[in-house]
Amino acid sequence: MATYIRLTDYKDSDSKEQGFFKSENRYEAKQEDFEKIPGSPIAYWAKEAIKKSFENNLLGSIIPVKKGMDTGNNDLFLKLWTEVNFNIIGIGLVNGQDTITQCKKWIPYNKGGEFQKWYGNKEYIINWANDGEELKQSTANLRSQHLYFKNAITWNALTSNTTSARFSDYGALFDSAGSSMFPSNLYNFYLSFMNTKIVDSLLKIINPTLNYGAGTVGNLPIIFPKQESVKQQIDTLTQECIEISKEDWDSRETSWDFTASPLLIENGKLRIENGKIEDAYNAYCEYWKEKFY
């Protein structure tokens, strides 16, 4: 048995000194307890229930959880979707052959990005002309090619605080910084699981460096609800979160599905009558306040 003092939440030396003498910052743990967690991290602050949770199936043993590609030259192979002719971007393609038959050069590319739950961060595209001919002839590390273009759940592998996962259903390829999982069903369940506070806590135990790559996420323990009513409720609520997040994302001009300024939209329809900007703005604020809160 060893005693540990956790001071990571204190910002400066003076507050750390004060925290050093507080009993709530002291923990006792056995070395063998660390071995219950994949990678044996020195997670002395983990409660017994958390350590016991790792006796369940790990996520990576149930579904593919994969690290994406490294192009070797992002400046050459990647663009923001707004930088190229939209007509040669292939959105929703099924496989690489579609880039040839439909004359598409650029494909959506999941690359992590800012904190964004449920849906969004659809900013980057990758040169996959002729089924990735140029990239395949380069020094790029093209991992897990059999999973390209498939529906996925992707997340920010690198984060400064809290991870966020999103549903990807637009025929994307994926980056090492936008690692992804590929369930064959139950997409909403896995997505909701990834966006829970408990997963955020588990990730910080498995890998305190906040680098949540495929290996780290694949070691998450997971339990499936037994009651069908609970499964249905999770599915319904998650789908609602996806739709709200998608509507929010598409309300910006940075989305390729943008149609009109949200100030011109009321209850999902284009405003017909002329009105004051102030009234439109207030209606906009009320609409999204109701959606999110």
Cite the ranges covered by each PLM segment.
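Structured secondary-structure scaffolds
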Residues: 103-106
